[in-house]
Amino acid sequence: MTELVGTVTPIRPTPLLAALQALRPHQWPKNVLVMVPLLTAHEWQRWSESLLAMVAMVFAASAVYLVNDLCDLTADRVHPHKRWRPLASGALNPIVGMAMAVVLVVGGLAIAWMVSLSVLYLIAGYWLLAAAYSAWLKRVAWLDVAVLVSFYVLRLVIGAWAVQRPVSWWLLGFIGAIFLALAACKRAGELTARGPEARRGYDAGSLRPLLLLAGSATLAVPVVLVLYSRSSVAAALYATPLWLTAAAPVLAGWLMRVIHIVRIGGMHHDPIIQAVRDPWAWAALAWTLICYGLALEPWR
C-alpha cells in the first residue's frame, strides 16, 4: 500500500499557483516571531513598525527560498519530495523565478528601510547567513543546527530593533531553547526517515546525541520561563507574572511529543508543516497566549 501511495503524481498547478507555492507560504508563520518583541515589551504604539518588519522578513525569506531552488534545480529533480517543487517540476519557469527573487529582494529592502536602517542591515545580514548556510554550513554537522537556531533568533532581534527596544536575553533564551529542540529534531528526523543520503555529515551514531540535545533543550524551556516569571523584569511588565509558569509544562509536553514522533519515524520532512498539522501544537500555542493574557490582567 505504501508503494502505491508513493507513485501518485501531484496535479500540475497553474502558473499563478506555482508562483505562490514557490514562495513557500507554509513557511511564513515563523516570521510571526518578528512581532514577539512587540508583545513581550508591550510597545503597542509601535505595531505598524513591527508589522512592516515582519512583511520585510517574509519578502527576504521567500527570496532565499527562490534562490535556493534555482541553485538546486538538478539535485531537487531527483529528490523524492523536492522534485514536486514548482521550479524543479517545471511548473514555474526559472526566468520567472529569477525575476520574482529580484522583486522580493528590492521590495524587502525597501520595506525594511521604511522601518529603520538597523532593520535593513539585519535583513541584509540574514541574506548573508542564508547564503553561507546554503553554500557550506548546512553540510557541517552540529554547526548547521546552531545556524538553524540563529535564523529564528535573528527574527527576534529584527523585531526588537523594529520597536526600538533592547533584545531581551530572557526571550532569546526561551525561544532559542524551543527552536534548538526543533532543529535537533529536524536533523534526527532526516536520519530516521531518509537514511544516509540525507545525513549531511551525520551518521547512525548521531541519532542518540541529537535526541539528547533536543531533550536537554526541552528541559531548558520551562526552566527559563519559570526563572523569568520570578524576575524583576517580569514583575515590571506583568500584573501577575506567575501565570506565565502555567504555560511551561504544556510547551515542554508538546516538545516531548515532537521528540517521540521523531523516535518512531513519523516526523514530516518539513517540521513547519508537521507543526501546522499538529493539533497539539495549536493547543500549546493557544494555552500560552491565554497564560500571557492572564499574566497581563488587562481588566485591572
Located regions from the model:
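Topogenic membrane-insertion module of multi-pass membrane proteins
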Residues: M1-R77, G90-V103
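C-terminal membrane-associated helical module and adjoining short loops/tails
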Residues: T2-L20, Q27, A135, V153-R300
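Short, amphipathic, aromatic/basic-enriched membrane-interface segments that mark the entry/exit
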Residues: A18-H26, P86-G97, M114-V119, L137-V145, ...
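Long, highly hydrophobic alpha-helical transmembrane signal-anchor segments
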Residues: K30-S48, L137-P166
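Generic alpha-helical transmembrane segments of integral inner-membrane proteins
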Residues: V32, V36, L51, V55-S62, ...
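Short, aromatic-rich membrane-interface segments at the entry and exit
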Residues: R46-L51, L117-I123, A141-V145, P166-L172, ...
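Acidic (Asp/Glu-rich) catalytic motifs at the cytosolic membrane interface
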Residues: M57-A88, L143, A184-T192, R257
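Multi-pass membrane catalytic core of lipid/isoprenoid biosynthesis enzymes
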Residues: L73, V78-I123, W169-L180, L212-G215, ...
